[in-house]
């Protein structure tokens, strides 16, 4: 770095980082286009709760982040500190919120113009890549997601 350049460091809490990711995705043209003209599927997860809150506000759709998760590992000290999970992913098709639906209900209808947001729960720092550790013995939500993403070229983003 030359003497005329400067750098700044910022400390973000986990919550602040999630809101930053959420605001960026809620402003992304491809994400908004999928929600308004095609199908946007946001899989339940703690980061995606912030993403959906920002998207729902932008799209004037109802949403409560409380319980927007499937598996939540809090450790023994906080085991009872979370709310019961919701029963549906956040799915918007052509601007309309599909209530009480999950990725399992819509995966077969997804195509190239559609978009899935599935939170990452693992990082490989050396390669700077995100990943998903699958806890279900039958593949969980990743199975229908992979069928859509690999088989029908549905776009997949790991916020």
What does each of the following model-derived ranges do?
Residues 2-4, 15-27, 57-140:
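Ligand-binding beta-strand-loop-alpha-helix segment within the catalytic cores
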Residues 32-37:
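Short helix-loop-beta connector
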Residues 42-47:
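Glycine-rich beta-strand-to-loop/alpha-helix junction loops that act as flexible
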Residues 50-51:
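Phosphate- and divalent-cation-binding pockets in alpha/beta enzyme and binding domains
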Residues 146-150:
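Anion (oxyanion) recognition and catalysis
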Residues 159:
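Active-site rim beta-loop-alpha module in soluble metabolic enzymes
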């Amino acid at each position: 770095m030359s003497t005329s350049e400067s750098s700044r460091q910022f400390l973000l809490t986990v919550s602040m980082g999630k809101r930053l990711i959420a605001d960026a995705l809620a402003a992304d043209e491809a994400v908004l286009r999928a929600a308004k003209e095609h199908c946007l599927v946001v899989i339940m997860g703690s980061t995606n709760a912030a993403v959906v809150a920002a998207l729902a506000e932008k799209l004037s759709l109802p949403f409560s982040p409380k319980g927007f998760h499937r598996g939540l590992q809090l450790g023994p000290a906080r085991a009872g500190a979370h709310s019961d999970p919701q029963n549906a992913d956040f799915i918007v098709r052509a601007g309309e919120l599909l209530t009480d639906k999950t990725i399992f209900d819509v995966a077969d209808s997804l195509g190239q113009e559609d978009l899935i947001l599935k939170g990452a729960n693992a990082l490989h720092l050396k390669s700077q890549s995100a990943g998903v550790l699958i806890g279900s013995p039958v593949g969980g939500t990743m199975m229908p997601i992979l069928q859509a993403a690999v088989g029908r070229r549905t776009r997949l983003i790991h916020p």
